[in-house]
Amino acid sequence: MRVGSRINDEEAMPLTAPESRARDSIDSSSTASISLTLVEGASHATTEPSKPAHNHNGRAQGNYAEKYRDDLEEDWEEDNYIPSNGKSNQRRTLIVFWLLVALCVGGWAVAFLFFVTSPGNKTSTSPHSGSNSPEGDVTKPGIPATGKKIPLDDAIGGVWSPAEHTISWITGAKGEDGLLLQKSEGGTGPYLHVEDVRNIHGTQSNNNSIVLMKESVFFVNDERISPEKVWPSPDLKTVLAMTREKKNWRHSFTGLYWLFDVETQTAQPLDPDAPNGRIQLATWSPTSDAVAFTRDNNLYIRNLTSKSVKAITTDGGTNLFYGIPDWVYEEEVFEGNCATWWSLDGKYISYLRTNETLVPEFPIDFYLSSPPGYSPKPNEESYPYVQQIKYPKAGAPNPTVNLQFYDVEREESFSVDVKDTLKDDDRLIVEVIPGSKGKVLVRETNRESYIVKVAVIDANKREGKIVRSDNIDEIDGGWVEPSHTTTYIPADPSAGRPDDGYIDTVIHEGYIHLAYFTPLENPKPKMLTTGKWEVVAAPSGVDLKNNVVYFVATKESPIDRHVYSVKLDGSELQMLKDSDKSAYYDVSFSHGAGYMLLKYQGPQIPWQKLISSPSNADNYIEILEENKKLAKLSNEFSLPSLHYSTINVDGFELPVVERRPPNFDETKKYPVLFQLYGGPGSQTVNKKFLVNFQTYVASSLGYIVVTVDGRGTGFNGRKFKCIVRRNLGHYESHDQIQAAKAWGKKPYVDKTRMAIWGWSYGGFMTLKTLEQDAGETFQYGMAVAPVTNWRYYDSVYTERYMHMPQNNEGGYENASISNATNLSQNTRFLIMHGSADDNVHFQNTLTLLDKLDILGVHNYDMHVFPDSNHGIYFHHAYKMVHQRKYFNLSFLGHGFFSFYSNFLPIRSF
């Protein structure tokens, strides 16, 4: 359940965020909601590209796999609504009852038809225009005009996604900075080439231009090979190419790997003796003469001067992983598929040994799909495919990890014992940073993530020691999260750096800031930044020639992002020139930090440009993307106006964004939807340009949509964030309820029509808020893929915030969704979940349903999506999720839930 800047869409911020990909379109609708969902679906053809189901291709199946059925359970007892005084009375009562039902539904249908056919309104102002201070109203209400309403398909299908270019920075063979790796488009020019950033369009002759692959295909033994991914060697003489990719988990995959020689334009298998062996990871040596790779969970090395491959490990298998992470480390620690690190001189390979022997398995059932190549046994075709995952839940045994080393020259593996490290069963290795001269930095935490230790290991001497140790619980009662941005700074006496060092983020006076540690063994850093603001995923780039560090921070406000620079001695802190004061920027630097791809992401229409860094005298600028099409689109449709403010709850200022419908009229009463995520350290209220489901609800359904980043969320200081420790859901739900009560007092809000929804952690927060509120403030809620009991979620994420269940039994009880009586006080709520969710297991929803059944709670609906994982997209499910939300918000918006609340649960399986 990693959160951070990679998350762009609020509803797609899962406990592990669903990947931001385009989802399948939908061509069928739930029979229970057909009267509403098809009105929207029939009038707007989707533009979403297709997307395969998670790691599974459909096996033999009939039309049932393409449809979803909502089974209306009609197990009502007759004496609940029919007097038992004779058949004629029963018949008469039935007639009256169904006439009333027909009148209600007919009246609703007329009102709804009027609503969906009424003309939209156009706003001529940007949906994110105006001042962007976090305090008070900052955007102008929409100006009355005639314009189009945003179709649901467009809002969720990527039509409004800004065009964005990805730059693959690469270092030249002689250390040249500002080079790009480019692929030709449309078959013009060489397929793969290196280009100077100043000649990005390839229109000029440039000494730094290098053709790596002339064609997009090559042949090996008459087999036609079309590479899907490529990684040039550091000397740019060989290209590592991958074909036949198969997705595994979120970040991991396997494929066939090839070595392509740039000079001869020929290729060979990475392992000539096993050309069809599926490789899980391959990494170049910094000296370009070898490739380390993992296959079948064992680590190998291929020296380019030889066609033979040497096995570094041989006992890898089901429970032992070498050089790659297991599921929980991939998901919660590294956020990637790599656990192999070369030393900077190429003499050593550091790799993680992961032992899952004691980790319990969790079964994931697939009813309609199975992995490619899977064939069931004869006469077992009707049984589900069951995938067993080693998944450590809170309190269960974790995988044990150890850092191993391989001496390339001596061809031997070894380990280094370091005194005072944590015990195997209480250790997470969260970051490994290779340095020079055989030095390696290793960061480890205890499994509850409040003890942090940094070790320096010398592979040459085969010794190491702990150089830093912090108890975060004693500092502020909080936790530490895995870092992926710690940067090694090599010694350079001529540049004023007599010793090696590294830049890290640390807690300083209640905020996250940059610190420079030098020499490596020095536990006391030079603070590069200070103040009541925070750095974000820093540093972003380091110019070693000029001793300048670049980073992104919240110095202007917690909901803004700007690019800053500071000297390594802590002087000359300054914002990038010509930046808008209130804006949201991101940046990608070349390896030498001489050039940057600057990305303006809001609040106005996003743009991108390539520029030289302030420490580079080149003074280069190239507009890469202006999103003119998106700007034109925003002028053709009615978009809500955004109003940023803060609300004080218990002395804490909570960031808020309110989306008001076009032609907003303060004399009218509007229904309100609260949308939330709320996970620890996350942020949903920010200045990014974003058109999504929330935009659609405000623009086309006439709702006010409010998002509040309550306590526990990020970038407002440690006190704001860490207060939720040991008691997830308590303060967060309280903040949402208090904010909703404040909105209910506004003259333009109809407090009898207030709803709340969220996905993943947001689903948990939705249910926890409804449970705590017990119908007092919110009438309706929608929870997608929710956690309902933190004992069921993975250990690394959960214990970071909750400790182990053995050490916090009361906290786990309080954080579970268990008060079915309180939930029954709400008018109605909806739960949706994918049956094959490998992240937030379907077990969470099933156990909640059992609690509701035990107490006879009826005021909810349920939709299960077969074979969908946490992103819910198998067989068009993603669109169905939003159609169900649309259906129910339309009901609430027209006041029909007061009647609908008496219906028994609608469960869609």
From Swiss-Prot:
Cytoplasmic topological domain: 1-94
Top EC class for this record: hydrolase
Start-end of Polar residues biased regions: 123-134
Gene3D superfamilies listed in its UniProt record: alpha/beta hydrolase (3.40.50.1820), Dipeptidylpeptidase IV, N-terminal domain (2.140.10.30)
Record-level Gene Ontology MF annotations: aminopeptidase activity; dipeptidyl-peptidase activity; serine-type endopeptidase activity
EC number in record: 3.4.14.5
Residues annotated as transmembrane: 95-115
Region (Disordered) residue spans: 1-63, 123-144
Disulfides per UniProt: none
Active site: 760 (charge relay system), 837 (charge relay system), 870 (charge relay system)
Glycosylation site list: 121, 207, 303, 355, 814, 819, 822, 888
Signal peptide: none
Protein topology in the membrane: Single-pass type II membrane protein
InterPro entries per record: AB_hydrolase_fold (IPR029058), Pept_S9_AS (IPR002471), Peptidase_S9_cat (IPR001375), Peptidase_S9B_N (IPR002469), Serine_Prot_S9B/DPPIV (IPR050278)
GO biological process: proteolysis
Biased composition annotated in UniProt, kind: Low complexity: 27-38
Regions of this protein lying in the Vacuolar compartment: 116-909
Subcellular locations according to the entry: Vacuole membrane
Reactions that this protein is recorded to catalyse: Release of an N-terminal dipeptide, Xaa-Yaa-|-Zaa-, from a polypeptide, preferentially when Yaa is Pro, provided Zaa is neither Pro nor hydroxyproline
Protein family membership: Belongs to the peptidase S9B family.
Function: Type IV dipeptidyl-peptidase which removes N-terminal dipeptides sequentially from polypeptides having unsubstituted N-termini provided that the penultimate residue is proline.
Record-given protein name: Probable dipeptidyl-aminopeptidase B
Annotated source species: Arthroderma benhamiae (strain ATCC MYA-4681 / CBS 112371)
